[in-house]
Amino acid sequence: MKEPEINVGIVNALEIAFTLNAKFLAKGETVSGKQRVSFDEGGISWNGNVYRELTFTPLEDDASFSLEDVTIGINFHWERQETQTFLGTLRLVVDEGKITAINQVPAEDYLTSVISSEMNATSSLEFLKAHAVISRSWLLAQIEKRKALSKQGSNFFPFLKTETEYIRWYDREDHTIFDVCADDHCQRYQGIT
C-alpha cells in the first residue's frame, strides 16, 4: 500500500508571506526565496498575476518552506503567531474570501511532526509509540470520513436525533478543502520547526 499524502491546512489570511528555502516549481518556473501572495479580485495575486490556486512543488526531497505569522493555540490563552517551516508541497487555495495555505506531505512525515509537537521528548518510548498509533488511526479515520462526505455531497447531516437523544458532531464539516488542520482543533502539527 502506498503511503497517503495528507493535506494539512496551516493558515488562512488575506495575505501570506513565506520563504521557499530551496528550489520549487510553480506555474512552470523555478522559484525560491521570499514570496508574498495576497487575496485580490477573488483570486491569489502573485508576481503580477491572479490565480485561483497556486502550487509550489519542491524539486528536492529535503526542500522546505517557511510560513510567517502562523497562529498556534487558536482561542487558547497562549495563542500567538510564529514562523514555521515545513517539508513537502505548498498549495495556496482561495477559500471564503481568503487564501488558505495547505501543506501536502506524506502521512508518516506528518505524524512525526504531530508526535514531536504534542508530546514531551522525555516521555517513555512506549508512551510515544501508543500516541503514534492513536494519531495515525485518528488521521486515517479523518481521511476516510472526508472521502465519504465528498461522495455524499450535501447530504451529510452532522447530527442524529432519536426520541431520547440529540447527538451533534462538531468540526467534521469545518474542513472541506484539506484533510486536517495544523492546530489543536485536529492534531498539533508544526512542521519541522
Q: Which residues are covered by each model-predicted region?
A:
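Conserved, single-site charged/polar hotspot
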Residues: 1-193
